[in-house]
From Swiss-Prot:
Any single GO BP term: carbohydrate metabolic process
Protein name: UDP-N-acetylglucosamine--N-acetylmuramyl-(pentapeptide) pyrophosphoryl-undecaprenol N-acetylglucosamine transferase
Record-listed UDP-N-acetyl-alpha-D-glucosamine binding positions: T12, G13, G14, N124, R162, S190, I243, A262, L263, T264, V265, A266, E267, Q288
SUPFAM superfamilies linked: UDP-Glycosyltransferase/glycogen phosphorylase (SSF53756)
Gene from which this protein is expressed: murG
GO molecular function, one term: undecaprenyldiphospho-muramoylpentapeptide beta-N-acetylglucosaminyltransferase activity
Organism whose genome encodes this protein: Alcanivorax borkumensis (strain ATCC 700651 / DSM 11573 / NCIMB 13689 / SK2)
Length: 357
């Protein structure tokens, strides 16, 4: 059996990229893909670049905001549900799969109203509001981190990552080929992380010395936050707004210093690279700390809260492992935690639901 699968994801790359990986798998199995996103969402252009049709709902954030947003939220939600229901009636999908984002909630609710089965995939160690609600309506619930939903019916499939990352050479062989000073890859995310851009260069010099090699992804329009600091310190650093080839960057690095979004944690594990996670302290439900602990509690990563990001704490965390051979051991343990076939597992369960099994 084939048919149309409605993929509901948007808002951040952490929702969209895992959804794209599963969509690619479903497409190879003969399903047509229709994407459901939000008007003016980042997913619009990205999804079209991957060759998928996208429909957009008039919907925005439901959680947080001022009194006006709280008062209008029920009406905006109802409007989005009605829009989604009209689309579903017209296109008759055999399955709706929600990954999170503004459109996922209204789309999932509309799907259930139209008697279309729903599958939910939660990327983080703590489910977001939309997925917590949708999981009560879903036929199958999928977890990126085992135990996220806290009930045995949920299926742990991991977080899908790009195949170029899972295809990287094994860490021990890769690290053995690295030459020169330690290679440090700093990832601030697509929007950048001010504390990593402004504070980390001086801390790296103080803790690891001048011989290190640095690549620093600082976020759109934020090169001026980091590049002049490296230059003033005399540190060898390549600063860029974005990194197009993440697989190559992970393969180059001995150590990654980054936030702990679900996708980043999954990529670190899949690549097999040592990482120091500095979780975003304002993340909802502190989910980034819990994401990072999935690896750090297994000796497969390092974890340092942002409030402790100073020379003394950073030295205490990094100096005991600041040798390429020791970092390679952490990288090996990280890769042992990866689920390389996550996209295939998720697609198989989706296919079974779509086929009524």
């Amino acid at each position: 059996m084939s048919g149309t699968v409605l993929i509901m994801a948007g808002g951040t790359g952490g929702h969209v990229f895992p959804a794209l990986a599963v969509a690619d798998q479903l497409r190879t199995r003969g399903f047509d893909i229709l994407w459901l996103g939000a008007e003016n969402g980042m997913e619009g252009n990205l999804v079209r670049q991957y060759g998928y049709e996208i429909a957009e709902l008039s919907v925005s954030r439901l959680r947080g905001g001022g009194i006006k947003r709280k008062l209008t939220a029920p009406f905006n939600l109802l409007r989005a549900v009605l829009q989604a229901r009209q689309l579903i009636r017209a296109r008759q999908p055999v399955l709706a799969v929600g990954f999170g984002g503004f459109a996922s909630g209204p789309g999932g609710l509309a799907a259930r109203l139209c008697k279309v089965p729903v599958v939910v995939h939660e990327q983080n160690a703590v489910p977001g509001l939309t997925n917590r609600l949708l999981s009560r309506l879903s036929t199958v619930t999928l977890e990126g981190f085992q135990g996220a939903f806290g009930h045995p019916q949920a299926c742990w499939v991991g977080n899908p990552v790009r195949p170029q990352i899972t295809a990287l050479e094994e860490p021990a062989r890769r690290y053995a080929q690295h030459q020169g000073g330690l290679r440090v890859l700093v990832l601030g995310g697509s929007q950048g992380a001010l504390v990593l851009n402004q504070d980390l260069p001086e801390l790296l010099l103080a803790v690891l010395g001048r011989d290190i090699q640095v690549r620093h992804q600082c976020g759109a329009g934020r090169t001026a936050e980091a590049a002049p600091i490296y230059q003033a310190l005399g540190l060898q650093a390549q600063v860029s707004e974005f990194i197009d080839d993440m697989a190559e960057a992970y393969g180059w690095a001995d150590l990654v210093i980054c936030r702990a979004g679900a996708l980043t944690v999954a990529e670190v594990a899949a690549a097999g690279v040592a990482a120091l996670f500095v979780p975003l302290p304002s993340a909802v439900d502190d989910h980034q700390t819990l994401n990072a602990r999935w690896l750090s509690e297994r000796g497969a990563a390092l974890l340092l809260p942002q409030r402790d990001l100073g020379a003394v704490s950073l030295a205490g965390t990094l100096k005991p492992v600041a040798e390429r051979g020791l970092l390679a051991q952490i990288a090996e343990r990280a890769r042992e935690q990866a689920m390389a076939d996550s996209a295939e597992r998720a697609a198989t369960l989706c296919e079974e639901v779509a086929n009524g099994r």
